[in-house]
Amino acid sequence: MKYAKKWISIDDQVDLLTRGKGLGCNNVDDLKRSLETIGYYRLSAYWFPYKTSSGDGKTVFREGTTFDEIMRTYEFDRRLRLLMFEAVARIEVFLRSRLAYFAAKEDGAFGYPDSARTKLSREYSAAKKSEQYIKHFANTYGDEHDLPPYWMIVECATMGTLELLFSKVSPSTRTAVASDLGVKVPVFKNWLSVLRVTRNACCHHSRVWNREWGVCPKIPNAWSWSGVANGRTFAVLSVIYHLLARIGDAAEPWRGELESLFEDFRDIGLDKVGVPSGWRDMTPWSRSE
């Protein structure tokens, strides 16, 4: 099928939304500014749940839907995404540290799995162009070593490479890292994929509200979840909170910010994030695991 939609001006976009589709708007200048700075297509993901079919088969906004309501949804998503990214960054730094520590202890400073060396070499080569500590190592020790030691290479490795490295190191190293984080190896291996996808979504400003995640977190049996979808953002938030609680004292302040966000935007509704009623009494939020 040929794509038929064509470019239209900002003024025409405003007219289409308000007159054509029935969006309530008290300030056209604000609507124009949002269309200019955020974009019609990006915003359409936030107004989609507010639309319905008209009698002639066209999609229009449900009666009473306002531009302010849609922008509150957008702002909720933006702030939730920032909270998630902050937490994933902490977890990623912890993972770099512990993976390097246990792998080097088990196999030596340069004991990389053969199946990971090609990818590590590519990232090492890229890092030599911009990272001073990598340049120093290459200039000083490059005649003897084609890669830097574990504790150095993990600092320039992508999340995808860390995920690969975890899957290839010795079983005892995988167990040590996963045990530090309070889960079994198969669960943490899945969670690494979840963290990578979440990190990428946050970095690229992708929507976390009303999202079905392509990689769904495995829920530990000990959590005893029943009837709760693990493909929604609530499941990802639960994984993040569990991991934060294992690595330091950031979990409760982060949770406080999350609960404040939920309260400030309670008119948005938490169903699109997958938050069930009574979630505070569920593991890991009850902290009873």
Q: What is the predicted role of each segment?
A:
Residues M1-T198, W209-E289:
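Extended intrinsically disordered or low-complexity regions, especially N/C-terminal cytosolic tails and loops
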Residues H205:
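Acidic/aromatic/glycine-rich contiguous surface patches that form carbohydrate-binding/processing clefts
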